[in-house]
Amino acid sequence: MSDLFAKLMDQIEMPLDMRRSSAFSSADIIEVKVHSVSRLWEFHFAFAAVLPIATYRELHDRLIRTFEAADIKVTFDIQAAQVDYSDDLLQAYYQEAFEHAPCNSASFKSSFSKLKVTYEDDKLIIAAPGFVNNDHFRNSHLPNLVKQFEAFGFGTLTIDMVSDQEMTEHLTKDFVSSRQALVKKAVQDNLEAQKSLEAMMPPVEEATPAPKFDYKERAAKRQAGFEKATITPMIEIETEENRIVFEGMVFDVERKTTRTGRHIINFKMTDYTSSFALQKWAKDDEELRKFDMIAKGAWLRVQGNIETNPFTKSLTMNVQQVKEIVHHDRKDLMPEGQKRVELHAHTNMSTMDALPTVESLIDTAAKWGHKAVAITDHANVQSFPHGYHRARKAGIKAIFGLEANIVEDKVPISYDPVDMDLHEATYVVFDVETTGLSAMNNDLIQIAASKMFKGNIVEQFDEFIDPGHPLSAFTTELTGITDKHLQDAKPLVTVLKAFQDFCKDSILVAHNASFDVGFMNANYERHDLPKITQPVIDTLEFARNLYPEYKRHGLGPLTKRFQVSLDHHHMANYDAEATGRLLFIFLRDAREKHGIKNLLQLNTDLVAEDSYKKARIKHATIYVQNQVGLKNMFKLVSLSNIKYFEGVPRIPRTVLDAHREGLLLGTACSDGEVFDAVLTKGIDAAVDLAKYYDFIEIMPPAIYQPLVVRELIKDQAGIEQVIRDLIEVGKRANKPVLATGNVHYLEPEEEIYREIIVRSLGQGAMINRTIGRGEGAQPAPLPKAHFRTTNEMLDEFAFLGKDLAYQVVVENTQDFADRIEEVEVVKGDLYTPYIDKAEETVAELTYQKAFEIYGNPLPDIIDLRIEKELTSILGNGFAVIYLASQMLVNRSNERGYLVGSRGSVGSSFVATMIGITEVNPMPPHYVCPSCQHSEFITDGSVGSGYDLPNKPCPKCGTPYQKDGQDIPFETFLGFDGDKVPDIDLNFSGDDQPSAHLDVRDIFGDEYAFRAGTVGTVAEKTAYGFVKGYERDYGKFYRDAEVDRLAAGAAGVKRTTGQHPGGIVVIPNYMDVYDFTPVQYPADDVTASWQTTHFNFHDIDENVLKLDILGHDDPTMIRKLQDLSGIDPITIPADDPGVMALFSGTEILGVTPEQIGTPTGMLGIPEFGTNFVRGMVNETHPTTFAELLQLSGLSHGTDVWLGNAQDLIKEGIATLKTVIGCRDDIMVYLMHAGLEPKMAFTIMERVRKGLWLKISEEERNGYIDAMRENNVPDWYIESCGKIKYMFPKAHAAAYVLMALRVAYFKVHHPIMYYCAYFSIRAKAFELKTMSGGLDAVKARMEDITIKRKNNEATNVENDLFTTLEIVNEMLERGFKFGKLDLYKSDAIEFQIKGDTLIPPFIALEGLGENVAKQIVKARQEGEFLSKMELRKRGGASSTLVEKMDEMGILGNMPEDNQLSLFDDFF
């Protein structure tokens, strides 16, 4: 009995008498398979013989009971050295088989369990009645019985059935007589029951209820069966089945309510073998609450029937029973203080390579009790801000690092060069063929060389070498060398010595010489021969520097380009001769083009400054040790992305050296130079390289396993030897050796997600390596790169011995973590740029404008508001933000553009006064433009100053101006006025680039950066990756599994970008590296702006961010101003004609039937969408305040639908009184009598959708206060439904712009349509648009039908919107002209009387550049032919043909050639 087996017997308390029996004498545990997710342990035992049945049953029962107590399921099977086929033992085990699944099925057990068995002719024979000896039982059940006997220890046993005629007759006779007796008894029982019933039947009114069926007892029995039921792996279900039990994790839940009030819970579960869709019905709310455990992330046991869902056509479980189960996550079982620190972990910011968020990585480390964890994403630090915040919250040290791409600044062409005339030198051009890429683990099989002088081959060397083992198929395929070539080969040492003699007094030459020289030196060293010391020329680097314009510099492409023969590439003799021919071509060109004659000149005069771009990348891990190191890290990341980017961010070694203070370096993974040296050059070379680093990394053997498949390492023993060699390198170099995990995902079962992400990159991607060549290439396996606990890591390194494993896994990693100081990644304060006298300027501009409008002295209400705002703005250092925004708006205004405000900036009266926003947040009021007399309405009776009736100033008679939207300042900077202002501005799209450049001009190029963004894999994209993986790798997933895999693969960084309008301004007394690295968006080194490396949201509370967005409204207003000469500022906000648009179409001179809508909203910003048009139709707004309500209602979430809409329909509230914008809540509650602070807090809770999420005590406090102040219940209930609310200032700015546009639609229609089609229309179909009303209406009808059938394309949907406006324009009596070759503009619509002439870009397929070219060409002269239009105008044949079909070209001939008869007429 083995020690392990004995220990198990102690644990299950197996009786001593059974343990001492002969059957247990050599008992052993062959293998234990542990399935952590399903909590199933599979034991495989070895015994000397098949166990006595009593012993087997005892072993089975004790195993099950012991492990069941720990919530673990157990199965086991036995391998017996000797098998006893006695009838008694076989009969006992035969009956035992029916106690085990799947042989315990009711139909099989009832028919077979009592039958007799015998052993005859090496078969187990079952004597059975004839009616069960059929194909169904043979095919369905006998294979299960064979498997069960194999598990008992009988080996593979042949089982057969024979029909027993005597048994068949006896059973048939018994069945017939029993059936007759049963029928007779049933008839008799029925008659007696009926008589008894008639005799006992009571009067109707005293009817006695039937005996109650004990449902509770039945349910208890059913539940007990559910608890003990066999769990079916999801992957095994392929057809409809009943009473199936699953266990797994819920990853998606959706609850729906039917029209009848029933509820359905659609959810998806996975057990990580596959995934399944499930549904559970609940008849009412009470029953629904019983299934609250069905939630995302919950682990459940469910039972139900598998059926095909008629809607999804997928197998779906209709759940009958459900129970939440305990899921045991992996734990780090080492004692406190003896746990490792993970120092090499990637997050989802490692581009298309890793999965965990930095938060989940840190949470896992903290949960396991680790004192620290490192972040080492590939070449970026975008996880730092979130990691910094999460680590502080979790109470764990975050070690901030990255895995960098290190390159040499200049890659030499020549190694060990000497002063030598290249023309007079003798060269030995050589090549080696090997069994792999590792000089330490693979073998030389051929050395070939050509000795050359002045371009001529003077001697050749060619020797095969027997490696002592058969060649792999891959080696033979690659090199063409077979075992036959090696039969008579000389010993390796003999060949090495001969080659050294051959190479004397010459320059060595090889293509990719570092490989060949490294391989030779490793073999020289192994055989105590001197290593290469003479000069070496690498023709690969020679070609890269001599011909930088070539994309490929491999031997094959170069020989083709220079027409050098290479018949058998990858055989050393052919490769060497071809390389020699190329060498002398290179030498000639170097001499003629660059004047290079001496060997020393190759490195000094020819190696390019940017040769780092072609240098081989080596990975290194870099860690921030202190605050100085953090800034140096930011500088390195910036330089690698801005100055040294080539395919990936690169860090030249000298650049790293210059910024190494405060940083620590590790040797990284198998792509690091120290690991590579151990593999290819030997320990001595690795020791020299290791001196550059602060520690040596080793990783679990499983991480290096793909190197075995790629034939870089022979086997597991080879991996372990490499790890030992790395430890030896650390010992010799006096560097600590640390075990790291190279984490790319957290849990082992998440491996498939990374597999899908990596394979989506396609062959050729750096991390998606392949094995083999050409069509036969297969993807190399990815390593098992989950986050390992200390125990798991110690197990991985157990081959090192307990003490050494503990040292590298625990002690050294903890010591390293202790060297890391706490650093501040994200600043705690706001750092705004400095503008001289910003505070004085803001105050001066404010009062200057206020005095101009309201007079001096100011009205108290104005004076107090300004004082309140300036106290906050100036006191918190926000003046520079205001002033910067004012300068930008002012510059755009000077260029002739209005600037619209977004967000809550219009809540600030100071912002209004200094010109940042047009929105005036004061209460509605009158003010006289002549004498500055003013009147304020402060009781809330008027929603907007624009709605006040017109009246003259009572003092001077001048017509009053009206303004004021009643918006509290608190909604912008918070109740205490200390919230960082977020000033968003809508510039004209045409002027946006100029506004961006204004920021640079104001603050300086080195302080202004575009706000960076990070683009991750969206779930829809991930879905495509999963389907592609299915297709490419022959996988077949059910829909639920596809959904799970897509969700798992989503969220990984894919690219970077920039905010469309956000610009970050760094204070001019600091530099950008105090806050963030910088880079180019999407790695586009030609971009005109650099961006913040961090997502701008990560630092938006530390630096000034200006939102300079492009918008159509200011562009539209500028276009209308240019067309009309009307200053948009002078357009009244209460124009009766404009307001009439919201109640009908009469003002347009058309009927609703003509334009297909009951109001004039088509094409009006904010109000022209189908959704808002519907709201207008329901509410009929008549005031500016009501339009603000509509804007708020349409932009909010759960503010209109199911809320305000119902209140208005039921007559409970009106458009004026419902909650529309967030600010209205505070203003309304203050007018009702609540304290401002409470009114503000309620507004904040409601607008963020937190009303139902706060504590019941807090919410009830607010409700009581509102009811005490007579706030109606419907208002309170409405608050509880809201998820998000729109700021009133934003609504006011948008509505004001919309009304200005609407003004032109009413009063200057042709100009409006011209501006609309030039700026807002997204799709055109000129043939239809120029074809008249009938053509337009017919096309609209066509698209409408397609929409109903969900067949309309996006372009057709956009076209429908355009055609609605065309139809309206035509119905109003205007005309849509045809494209005119000589009158149409390139990009703008033209007005000719009552007709619009479309521009060239309106023609489908004709872009802006061609449009401008046509206009330019026609100015040079008339187009005499279609050929000339194509040639001078740049139009394609397709475009010319389309123009001709539309009648634009008239009778234009095909070409300019004159007819032979033209001269006669």
Swiss-Prot record:
InterPro entries: DNA_pol3_alpha_NTPase_dom (IPR011708), DNA_pol3_finger (IPR040982), DNA_PolC-like_N_II (IPR024754), DNA_PolC-type_N_I (IPR028112), DnaE2/DnaE/PolC (IPR004805), DNAPol_HHH (IPR029460), DnaQ (IPR006054), Exonuclease_RNaseT/DNA_pol3 (IPR013520). GO terms for biological process: DNA-templated DNA replication. It is an enzyme of class 2 (transferase). One of its GO terms (molecular function) is DNA-directed DNA polymerase activity. It is found in: Cytoplasm. The keyword Nucleotidyltransferase applies. Coiled coil: none annotated. It catalyses: DNA(n) + a 2'-deoxyribonucleoside 5'-triphosphate = DNA(n+1) + diphosphate. Residues 427-583 form the Exonuclease domain. GO terms for cellular component: cytoplasm. PANTHER family: DNA POLYMERASE III POLC-TYPE (PTHR32294:SF5), DNA POLYMERASE III SUBUNIT ALPHA (PTHR32294). NCBIfam families: dnaq, polC_Gram_pos, PRK00448.1. This is DNA polymerase III PolC-type. It comes from Streptococcus pyogenes serotype M28 (strain MGAS6180).
